[in-house]
């Protein structure tokens, strides 16, 4: 199995699928091609939440603001999964989670997955603006058909790669200071505050204003604001049947203070 994920929209992913299908008979599943454009951190968050639900697969991810520059291409092996992506950190959080799931993640947070640089020459690229088609799709096909990334001549083991970590919240007695990590398509503003922080609390204050804590959006009337815990396990600022980001006046990267 192979998955594809990008910020390309349409129809660019079709060209990637064509390149892959010409090289391998892998079953292809499109995760999404609607990541926020050039937003590596948002893509990394959602990949971390989605890809662990797949059986062993090769995952081709292209969110690549550095396309056409000297940024490297990497292949990351985590558990029974291989991730092919630009070296900008986009697949590092999910690699850590996949390593956790297989019990391979040890004391050093970088242990449990292996990274190879996938070597290529600029002269091989038909376009300097579409490495998804010219670089990552062929690389993913080759990785899919190989027994292991290390069996490919183009794969060179490396300990130097771009890391990406989400910020930790500041939690103390009666107070949590977090950050908006992403806003989903419903307008739910997802924080980095773990859900257990609000367990048993109702209400809490969000930036000084009291807001009810609920397990489900529909426990309140349409248009009412709430704090809830999303399926990802983090605290969300939400509105029943409307957009929490607008109602709370927040966007990605904003600081949020919860106290009780």
What are these regions (language model features)?
Residues 25, 41-42, 55-56, 60-117, ...:
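Active-site histidine-anchored catalytic micro-motif
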Residues 11, 15, 38, 42-45, ...:
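Conserved active-site and cofactor/substrate-binding residues in soluble primary-metabolism enzymes
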Residues 1-2, 12-16, 98-110, 146-154, ...:
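Haloarchaeal acidic low-complexity proteome signature biased toward cell-envelope/secretome components but also
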Residues 121-192, 197:
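Anionic-ligand-binding alpha/beta catalytic cores of soluble enzymes and soluble regulatory domains
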Residues 1-73:
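N-terminal glycine-/serine-/threonine-rich phosphate-binding loop
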Residues 190-249:
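A conserved acidic, glycine/proline-rich C-terminal tail/linker
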């Amino acid at each position: 199995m192979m998955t594809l994920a990008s910020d390309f929209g349409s129809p660019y992913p079709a060209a990637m699928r064509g390149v892959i299908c010409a090289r391998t008979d892998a079953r292809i599943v499109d995760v999404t091609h609607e990541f926020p454009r050039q937003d590596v951190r948002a893509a990394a968050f959602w990949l971390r939440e989605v890809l662990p639900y797949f059986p062993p697969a090769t995952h081709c991810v292209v969110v690549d603001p550095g396309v056409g520059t000297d940024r490297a291409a990497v292949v990351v092996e985590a558990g029974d999964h291989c991730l092919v992506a630009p070296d900008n950190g986009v697949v590092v959080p999910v690699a850590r989670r996949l390593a956790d799931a297989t019990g391979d993640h040890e004391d050093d947070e970088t242990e449990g997955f292996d990274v190879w640089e996938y070597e290529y020459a600029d002269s091989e690229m038909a376009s300097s603006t579409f490495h998804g088609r010219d670089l990552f799709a062929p690389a993913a096909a080759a990785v899919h058909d190989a027994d292991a990334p290390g069996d490919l001549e183009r794969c060179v083991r490396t300990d130097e790669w771009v890391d990406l970590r989400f910020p930790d919240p500041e939690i103390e007695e009666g107070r949590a200071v977090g950050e908006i990590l992403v806003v989903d398509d419903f307008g739910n503003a997802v924080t980095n505050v773990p859900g257990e922080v609000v367990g048993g609390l109702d209400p809490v204050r969000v930036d000084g204003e009291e807001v009810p804590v609920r397990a489900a959006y529909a426990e309140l009337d349409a248009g009412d604001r709430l704090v809830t815990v999303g399926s990802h396990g983090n605290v969300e600022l939400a509105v029943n049947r409307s957009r929490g980001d607008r109602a709370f006046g927040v966007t990605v990267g904003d600081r949020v203070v919860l106290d009780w």
